[in-house]
Structures are given as structure tokens and as C-alpha cells.
Amino acid sequence: MSSDYEKEVLRRTLEHERGTWREDLRRRFAPWFDPLVWGFRCHDGWSGIITELTEEIARIVGGPEGAPDLRVVEVKEKLGGLRYYVWHVPEKHALAIAEAKQRAEERSFETCEVCGKPGRLVQSDGYWHTACPAYEDPRSFRGD
């Protein structure tokens, strides 16, 4: 970690994630999520998709021991879909991991990011997100 700022962001992120699926994923698949300074930048509705994708990557490579240099560097929502960025993927597993990521990203466009119920891609005031009817208005979950 390169700066005091990043260390403070990580400290706050880990504090925020304490007791959640995010903390569990970091624990189960360490060192893959070390440091993931910015945390998981999406709502809890995609927790199942993210967990299943991570478990699938683990099956593909043989667990963290099979790819000790692999790093999940960012997990976020972008333009309504899941983005899961991984570095240092073993070349022999690159295609299988890319296909697994593609399937997870496709599922995210059918799953409400907030609650995990079936959803659809919607646009509201220039903001694209995947939501069920209860969360189509971004103000319903962003606190605006």
C-alpha cells in the first residue's frame, strides 16, 4: 500500500465490512482480496453473484493455493452491471475465468443490485442501474 491515505481508506472499509458477506469473502479467499482498498462498490443484492463467481474462480484455479498471485482489484457497479476486475490470472485459466466473469456480469443485469430480486436495467436522471420495481428510483436506496 503506497500512502497513508490508502491505509486510512482500507481501515475504514474493513470497519464498514465487519460482520458482512464482504468480510467473509475476504477471509475465505485471502490473499486474493488483499488489499482491495476501495472495498466492494455495489449493494448487497449482488452478494450471491459475487460469492458464486469467486467460488467458481477458486474451483477453476484450485483455490488460493493454485493461484497465490491472483488479486481481485476491484468489484463494483458500472453502468448498471457488475464489474469484477482480476489481475495476475494464470494464463492457462484466463479463458475459463473470463467466461465465468461474463456469466456473472450477465446475471447482474437481471438481478436487483439492492435486494437481489429479479430486476432489469433502468435509467433514471442519467443514472443506469439494475433494479426491481421497488428500487427503480435511485433515490429509494441512495438516500437522496
Which ranges hold each PLM region?
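Aromatic-residue detector
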Residues: 8-11, 20, 46, 114
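Eukaryotic low-complexity, non-globular regulatory regions
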Residues: 1-5, 9-13
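Interaction interfaces in information-processing and related assembly proteins
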Residues: 15-98
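Cys/His-clustered metal-coordination modules, chiefly Zn-binding fingers
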Residues: 95-144
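Sequence-level detector for tyrosine residue identity
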Residues: 5, 16, 84-85, 127, ...
